[in-house]
Amino acid sequence: MLYRFRRIAWSGILCGAPLLAQAPSGDVFLLRGATVHTISGPVIEDGSVLVRNGKIVGVGHNLSAPDGATIIDLRGKHVYPGMIDAGAMLGLEKTSSSQASDGHEIGLFNPQLRAVTAVNPADEQIPAARANGVTSLLEMPMGDLIGGQLSLIHLDGSANDSMTISASAAIYLRFPAIETRPVPVHDHDDDDDEPTTAVEPEAVSYSLAKKAFEVKMQALDTFFEDVRRYRVAKSAKAPGFAPDRRYEAMIPVLEGTTPMFVAATREREIRGAIAFADAQKIRIILADPFEAYKVLPLIKSHNIPVVLGPTLTLPLDVDDDYDRSYTTPNDLFKAGITFAIATFSSRLSRNLPYQAAAAVSFGLPHDEAYKAITLNAAEILGMGKRLGSIDEGKVADLIVTDGDPMETMTHVTQVFIDGKPVSLDTRQKRLYEKYLARP
């Protein structure tokens, strides 16, 4: 069995500039003299960004600072929108084998559960990701079929409600697969050669695997039928109608206001997920579709956005091309498919910029790579008018760097989340400084 894993080779977050240098003291501040990478438009040399009450209110050259505003001189620096990890489990899972982890629910259908309620704001991985420029991410509740509601959060706050951007950005569905030897879904956390599961799952015959697949598909179809009946009964105010939180959570899916975030790795599951979405008349986002390159015309014809898994991973099968995960982003770009890149990890969101960078070496245009972890991610998650670029009216999620954030030698020197400066201190940095000072 081939387990997918990544080796961590990045240590940039251990080195950095002063944590809150030139931090604004008021609600209005002007970033002046930097190279501003808006992402939605051209790069602005010697540009300025004016922020008021957490929102960007001005972008351009030679902006004037209002009375009382803090002016931050950023000559020689770069300003980018904060990165968005469009699929992760930070704060949900500390140690994969620990019973204290709260990232996976039992039961086939749990659409009423919201990931944000289980997030631990004190997780040490949150400041580590933040210090490398990740300002928000999509928390993923895992489950057998429908795991719950994915929540988009800011990586700053002492309580769940203060971190929440959207408590219900999508609903997670692990699309059924014919698995003769099941592979853990979103297995992107391995730092060594060991699988994340304590016991390797036993192989089963194809006939048994196909039967299990058919049972799950039948259960999924029946569940959607039940939701439709529930919606009709609710609208008709039928006698004896009893509210059901599971069905209530699914009504926005049927109405088209909330998409399903569908995990479908192989070609067969991807085709099945698209056919299921057509039959149910629902919107979907394809999550971690490793074999998307095999069905590009199908995905494009249905206008389905894609959230790719990390590029820094091994091929899915032993006979896959060695560079398969590196080239898929460019394949999607050339096909005209909107896509983002995510880590699907409980502790490696800090490496998000390098996941995008790897695709650049294999053909993806540089600007498109950064869009895949900013503006594209925001648009796929329905937040394109609020996040993902440096434009007037958007939330001031900004990072200041001394170079290209997708380069491992670049330092993130300042981070603003919702217009507020945040600390770049991390446990890793404290340990680095502790042992650096050792006699």
Name each region found by the language model.
Residues 1-13:
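Bacterial N-terminal signal peptides that target proteins for export
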Residues 19-26:
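Boundary at the C-terminal end of the N-terminal hydrophobic targeting segment
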Residues 25, 36, 40-80:
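Histidine-rich, glycine-flanked metal-binding segment
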Residues 34-37, 391-435:
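C-terminal cap of metal-dependent C-N hydrolases
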Residues 95, 100-112, 259, 300, ...:
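His/Asp/Glu-enriched, well-ordered alpha-helical/loop segment
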Residues 97-119, 159, 184-202, 303-308:
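Active-site gating loops and adjacent loop-to-helix segments of metal-dependent hydrolytic enzymes
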Residues 125, 130-284, 411:
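Polyanionic/metal-chelating signatures
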